[in-house]
Amino acid sequence: MSALRVTSPSVEYVQRPLGLDAAHPRLSWPMASAAPGRRQSAYQVRVASSAAGLSHPDVWDSGKVVSDDSVLVPYAGPPLKPRTRYFWSVRVWDADGGASEWSAPSWWETGLMGASQWSAKWISAPAPLTEAPSLEGSSWIWFPEGEPANSAPAATRWFRRTVDLPDDITGATLAISADNVYAVSVDGAEVARTDLEADNEGWRRPAVIDVLDHVHSGNNTLAVSASNASVGPAGWICVLVLTTASGEKKIFSDASWKSTDHEPADGWREPDFDDSGWPAAKVAAAWGAGPWGRVAPVASAANQLRHEFRLPHKKVSRARLYATALGLYEAHLNGRRVGRDQLAPGWTDYRKRVQYQTYDVTSSVRPGANALAAYVAPGWYAGNVGMFGPHQYGERPALLAQLEVEYADGTSERITSGPDWRAASGPIVSADLLSGETYDARKETAGWTSPGFDDRAWLAVRGADNDVPEQIVAQVDGPVRIAKELPARKVTEPKPGVFVLDLGQNMVGSVRLRVSGDAGTTVRLRHAEVLNPDGTIYTANLRSAAATDTYTLKGQGEETYEPRFTFHGFRYVEVTGFPGKPSTTSVTGRVMHTSAPFTFEFETNVPMLNKLHSNITWGQRGNFLSVPTDTPARDERLGWTGDINVFAPTAAYTMESARFLTKWLVDLRDAQTSDGAFTDVAPAVGNLGNGVAGWGDAGVTVPWALYQAYGDRQVLADALPSVHAWLRYLEKHSDGLLRPADGYGDWLNVSDETPKDVIATAYFAHSADLAARMATELGKDAAPYTDLFTRIRKAFQTAYVASDGKVKGDTQSAYVLTLSMNLVPDALRKAAADRLVALIEAKDWHLSTGFLGTPRLLPVLTDTGHTDVAYRLLHQRTFPSWGYPIDKGSTTMWERWDSIQPDGGFQTPEMNSFNHYAYGSVGEWMYANIAGIAPGRAGYRQVVIRPRPGGEVTSARATFASLHGPVSTRWQQRSGGFVLTCSVPPNTTAEVWIPADHPDRVQHTHGTFVRAEDGCAVFEVGSGSHRFTV
């Protein structure tokens, strides 16, 4: 009997995955053993249609395969069938020929595996529910002072109009916008207001407000206060659309409104206020004219779709819901929410592909009447995306749903989305990823997700087949979910009635609100990362992202509200309109991210470094949300390639990032231009560029980082054709293999600009070098890439490296890139490294690097014999340094080294995120050199364990969950001695580096001395726990 035991088998990185489309899913089986030095010599996999059938498998038996492969082993049996659960088990043989017990049965289940298996139709809510009122016919108006379309004072003006309305109103919708902000009331009741945005361009995004509950037959008074934030064009515009039995009636903003430039007395919003002395408003410009152009409101409600059906009185053996959306959806079946996913189906380029989800709903279906329902919201498909506004992919969110029910007698049936579904509006009045969600609990539709609900007044859906993407594929990455909750720690009241709740941690997600009050009471929740000096929330850095959730109470005891279709980056929540004073239990943070296990535990004797690790982890947690975003708070939240280029190696330490980044690499390849350029962001959106050094190269560096971390050869195989096209693009757009001096450069460096041609050519060489390594790992011809690298290297040295080792630009990043990418002649490496250290010393031992130089800075110093300088930089506490933001109270990584400046002021708000993981790329160095854990071979088949004591660090401990099993280290330096305990999992080996000038000084267990190198005694060990003492 073998001493090996299989633990936690997984398929495509997941234990028991539901809904795989992979034709040859990869199987992994970590192992455990009480005996040291255990390795696998062979394995046998069995696959069957039932757990009981594994002893005589009816699908596949690999037989005994002589191999030590135990991670990502492809299924090699007969073709898999769609919608089928496959059970599997594995046993292994050790090096002595002993066989293990069979692992406990596990399973994976296939999804639909192709377009032919879909019979559902795309459906959308009808036009009345998805189209916003047009402002055409309205005018931009202002107080009559000069020419407001050209220039008006920075001031507030007030406007009123009384209108006579009929008694048969069935709908009332107000569309309104102002340059810059407004508050609007109907008969004294405020129905909407806006706050000043950092870009002062909120007028580009007119609001759409349902005011049916506020209007009535007879005279109604509309009142607007509008403010011009600075000297310049001023105006506001609106249309009130009334639906009556006899048709539509529209009330426009025009010269019939009254206006004043003197702040009116209390009650000016009320119907009986005397405005006879107010002059008529002035038309500044007709809609479509003036400086504002053809601004258009956008309908952003989350509509409700439903369908009832009957099932026979037969025993159900299995039921699955396959669903997706153009937009976002949340499915319900017979009154129960389906699954726990948030923001499904996530973000892709919907023109090319959308991911579908698979849910086990066996326990939810029932004989007789059933109801399948869903909320459908705009999301990334039709809502605001980044700074580019709405409708980046389409205007009408749509749903695709297919419920498949199988019975014990072998029969089955499908219930699909189609023309027989019904649609209506609901309590989610608006839902936008950037602006936030507006929820009116008075509009809740009791029972609409359950059978027996009367939907005869609902509207018929319409088809959406013209908008369908090219491919519908099973979800590759984990779903977005609520991972944890954070209670509020403190409540302050910086202004009367304005409460600020501190969650203690900059996070991403939304909040749960608990509140009691009268029906119609409206509570506003605004989100921010930091506070102003006066204790109010600081929102200028959010730019146009309103980040505001609004809840209107229904007045039925304690009410709970959790937004469904938005997310925010925040630590602080401003609460206004709350009945009474909120307590710390009134608001709870709901932390949201793409689900994946966290894989790295790390602690040292230096509190600042422990906090740095926490900030790195929280930064990744918040920005790994469907795509790797640059920031989760402001109006951007895009999949910037440059950020993940530098952060991917760290990401693969701290979280299981294989599935998430594999999915994103598909997004990146979907965005690749026809001539081979990778885009600045993926999914590609807006008018951003492509072909940029250090950004587009993510198409090369990210697959390589994943391969190093997981040994996933399929990532390389999928990437190499696009990498080849990228290199052809770069070569085509070079002059003598030197790239042009354009792009973003060493973004946000500290007054130390590196020439952009140096950066671009260095990255060109680096991508060619990695392409050669990829080809070698895949058994393909690497010679063309090696030759390309050699030629670029020579051109680089000729153009940029002087005979004394100085590099053009003479900046820290110039030397960092040149040294780390092997572009300096060997004879000049020491001179270049010494020059780098001199530049650091000249800045009083501070760094000056930006996004591209920072991740390579400490590794280069270590590789060139300057680990002491690396530690000196790591421990710095003054600007610019990693310690500076921590001393300023950061709980995530900042976009800038000085997002909060030494005097307490904020950096420029246009580019000042407090949750931006790029500078967290230092984690890779910390985990490899302080924890001492790094891959010696791809996927940690061999582990390099090399803690490097230095600086203030005298002890550290870490555990890394590799695909083979946990790798751990714990070390301490004391009284001139050194103690290391480490463990590595079965079927791996480790090379352990002990700081000792002679192996005889090292006491150890199970280790074999192999060489002395670089002041260390190097030992080889097998699996198990080991102790080394100097």
UniProtKB/Swiss-Prot annotation:
Residues given in the record as alpha-L-rhamnose 1 binding sites: D630, R634, D635, E636, D643, W695, H916
Biological process per Gene Ontology, one example term: carbohydrate metabolic process
PANTHER family: ALPHA-RHAMNOSIDASE (EUROFUNG), ALPHA-RHAMNOSIDASE (EUROFUNG)-RELATED
Region annotated Carbohydrate-binding module-67 (CBM67), chain positions: 133-297
Residues involved in Ca(2+) binding: D179, N180, N228, P233
Residues binding alpha-L-rhamnose 2: D179, N180, W203
pH dependence, entry free text: Optimum pH is 6.
InterPro entries linked to this entry: 6-hairpin_glycosidase_sf, 6hp_glycosidase-like_sf, Alpha_rhamnosid, Bac_rhamnosid6H, Bac_rhamnosid_C, Bac_rhamnosid_N, FN3_sf, Galactose-bd-like_sf
Active site residues per record: E636, E895
E.C. numbers: 3.2.1.40
UniProt domain comment: The carbohydrate-binding module-67 (CBM67) binds L-rhamnose, it does not bind L-galactose or L-fucose, demonstrating that stereochemistry of the sugar at C4 and/or C2 are important specificity determinants. Also, removal of calcium through chelation or mutation abrogates L-rhamnose binding, confirming the importance of calcium in the binding of its ligand.
Membrane-crossing residue ranges in chain numbering: none
Protein's name according to its UniProt entry: Alpha-L-rhamnosidase
Domain of life: Bacteria
Keyword tags: Calcium, Hydrolase, Metal-binding
Effect of D179A: Abrogates L-rhamnose binding
Annotated function: Alpha-L-rhamnosidase which is able to degrade p-nitrophenyl-alpha-L-rhamnopyranoside (PNP-Rha) in vitro. Releases L-rhamnose from citrus flavonoids such as naringin, rutin and hesperidin, and the arabinogalactan-protein (AGP) gum arabic. AGPs are a family of proteoglycans that are localized on the cell surfaces of higher plants. Cleaves both the alpha-1,6 and the alpha-1,2-linked rhamnosyl residues.
A molecular function (GO) term: alpha-L-rhamnosidase activity
Temperature remarks: Optimum temperature is 50 degrees Celsius.
